[in-house]
Amino acid sequence: MNRRDFLKGIASSSFVVLGGSSVLTPLNALAKAGINEDEWLTTGSHFGAFKMKRKNGVIAEVKPFDLDKYPTDMINGIRGMVYNPSRVRYPMVRLDFLLKGHKSNTHQRGDFRFVRVTWDKALTLFKHSLDEVQTQYGPSGLHAGQTGWRATGQLHSSTSHMQRAVGMHGNYVKKIGDYSTGAGQTILPYVLGSTEVYAQGTSWPLILEHSDTIVLWSNDPYKNLQVGWNAETHESFAYLAQLKEKVKQGKIRVISIDPVVTKTQAYLGCEQLYVNPQTDVTLMLAIAHEMISKKLYDDKFIQGYSLGFEEFVPYVMGTKDGVAKTPEWAAPICGVEAHVIRDLAKTLVKGRTQFMMGWCIQRQQHGEQPYWMAAVLATMIGQIGLPGGGISYGHHYSSIGVPSSGAAAPGAFPRNLDENQKPLFDSSDFKGASSTIPVARWIDAILEPGKTIDANGSKVVYPDIKMMIFSGNNPWNHHQDRNRMKQAFHKLECVVTVDVNWTATCRFSDIVLPACTTYERNDIDVYGAYANRGILAMQKMVEPLFDSLSDFEIFTRFAAVLGKEKEYTRNMGEMEWLETLYNECKAANAGKFEMPDFATFWKQGYVHFGDGEVWTRHADFRNDPEINPLGTPSGLIEIFSRKIDQFGYDDCKGHPTWMEKTERSHGGPGSDKHPIWLQSCHPDKRLHSQMCESREYRETYAVNGREPVYISPVDAKARGIKDGDIVRVFNDRGQLLAGAVVSDNFPKGIVRIHEGAWYGPVGKDGSTEGGAEVGALCSYGDPNTLTLDIGTSKLAQACSAYTCLVEFEKYQGKVPKVSSFDGPIEVEI
């Protein structure tokens, strides 16, 4: 694999001058800004760093950044993120909310009828709504804690701006955790002493040098490493290319344990071990049983570095519950034959073994268990802390495993109030409710205010939420069960959303404020989150389209409405803030890394920190566990957690446990009615819902104008479905349309629809207005129309999107127009 291979498919469109459209920047805007159209400017995104050039006043050419040797073809969709019909052009207010305010008919929310207003009007309505909620309900009535992937950039962080500005008005309900790793980041501190999921992992060079076996467990790094939290470097692909060669030469054995054939498995040409969805824990327990019964485990490591093995063994061997977790017990559940399980156990202890866990495996009911059990297996093997051995929970994310430069990164715009600042409504009275709730339980809170739940050893009392604020995140993408969300939104008095595009979250809002894209403002960011290769100047390409504003400008204006503009900005503008953040970073790196003055940096577009040193995760702990203990209560790896055991939870006990799911395919509960497991993993052609709006790029993968649904040949034949057919996928929670792709990569009983597909509900008559109805058909193919909205367990209370069964059929009715991408029905009054 080389750079040329990665550039195929990019070259044909990235270097071609593109024509204009009705949403293009006027020529005089560029002239007024003094922008040189012959100059290549540098910027970055979650999809990587790149350069842009303008022609006739618009973004015309996009090419990869010089240092990105493995750019993703997603940069072909960048221009469509700026120029597309989904852009929020002006401040807009839902029709009935404009007429009646907090007494509006909330059942009309989602009918997509909006009225254009001025910025002054919109921000005044925003403040008035906050005043009303704080006066009537106090801070428990407002939830502004939901966050998402936002856009890259340290200054224009939508989360920071929203929370700082709203915090100047008053307090509000916050969240804990996230949707990506909610179960993992909660359970692993009890087991390994840190969240692990966002921790730097053992360096790829050490893995390639020392590993004999790599187990990719529900992990697809080749797909997921295309994007990153900051501007991605894509250096991991160089290591994947080396790994591919070592697999070919027989020097490293890679086993992909997954219900489907992943892009990584196909790229590496490695072994595939199919496992039935949601049954990984049974396979892991059977491996443990084999290791115990054949004495294959490292007893010395267990005794010296872990706690609780003695409590765990009786469960595995069946002396505790009468069920021995043998390979024969696991085989009919997980679908892996007993002799294969035994061979796998021998392989794992034969040489140096590195587990690489994916995140999707913990986004299911009891999602804490596979992460905990995987850590137990790694402990039994005894190689935690050795180069090329042990366990990782993040080698598919943001260049984890690429040696870090170790340089200080630039700070960000502050999300909290400055010292001695107080909000206008300075109340901390949450009326007996909790001020923080698990991130994935906010719909529960709206529907059941006052209810008490267990969460991570504490009691959480749901607040009575009346108003929501979203900025730079799209919960109508990442939360589960659209129709349940509609029912909850009927109870809200006001919803405010700040976004670039008319996402479904905007559609179900009352006040919508137009933010500009990353490419219409200046910013700075780290180049590579974990590699930390340098600092990138994110230079404005064009002026903001229509009446959109940067996040900084939107909330500066809002702060002015509050009478707190100078407090908010610290009396600095955009470029002053960028220079301040840069200079603070320069001071932190003094004597370690050379950084030019800000003007030179901005002209160059980039500061390079250089390569980093290789590193082994948990090596210090292994070398001396007394001096370098883990962050667990005992300082050791906790196979059995006394703390969790004391919680007394029936769905997360003191050691890893197999528990049946509410619904499970391949003979599990609910499979008689809905026999198909829906896999709604991260997409390969966008970041969550970001870039779905890019029309020309979307058309390169859409099927018959819909999101693809990947189907096994067996299931397709049984239902008379062929490639390109429009398919209705459904269960008792909802229904959607998608375009069929029949593929041998998917075994019987499994379909895949990538999350991030824009929700586009239509009524029974196919109308956009009818999309407000509970039960409406999603016209484009959002899988979270169908997913189950329950917590993983009483411990994490995280999302369980992967616990989802469906059925599907060839769609026979009149095919409705997709309602996801064309924006609202604009009403004049």
Curated annotation (Swiss-Prot):
It catalyses: trimethylamine + 2 Fe(III)-[cytochrome c] + H2O = trimethylamine N-oxide + 2 Fe(II)-[cytochrome c] + 3 H(+). SUPFAM superfamilies: ADC-like, Formate dehydrogenase/DMSO reductase, domains 1-3. Its EC number is 1.7.2.3. Induction: By TMAO and DMSO. It comes from Shewanella massilia. The gene is torA. It comes from the Bacteria. This is Trimethylamine-N-oxide reductase. Predicted to be exported by the Tat system. The position of the signal peptide cleavage has been experimentally proven. Belongs to the prokaryotic molybdopterin-containing oxidoreductase family. Residues 1-31 form the signal peptide. Its cofactor is Mo-bis(molybdopterin guanine dinucleotide). GO terms for molecular function: electron transfer activity; molybdenum ion binding; molybdopterin cofactor binding; trimethylamine-N-oxide reductase (cytochrome c) activity. Keywords: Metal-binding, Molybdenum, Oxidoreductase, Periplasm, Signal. GO terms for cellular component: outer membrane-bounded periplasmic space. Binds 1 molybdenum-bis(molybdopterin guanine dinucleotide) (Mo-bis-MGD) cofactor per subunit. Disulfide bonds: none annotated. GO terms for biological process: anaerobic respiration. Reduces trimethylamine-N-oxide (TMAO) into trimethylamine; an anaerobic reaction coupled to energy-yielding reactions. Mo-bis(molybdopterin guanine dinucleotide) binds at S180. It is found in: Periplasm. PANTHER family: TRIMETHYLAMINE-N-OXIDE REDUCTASE, TRIMETHYLAMINE-N-OXIDE REDUCTASE 1. Although torA is induced by both TMAO and DMSO, only TMAO is used as a natural substrate. InterPro entries: Asp_de-COase-like_dom_sf, CT_DMSOR/BSOR/TMAOR, Molybdopterin_N, MoPterin_dinucl-bd_dom, Mopterin_OxRdtase, Mopterin_OxRdtase_prok_CS, Prok_Mopterin_Oxidored, TAT_signal. It is an enzyme of class 1 (oxidoreductase).
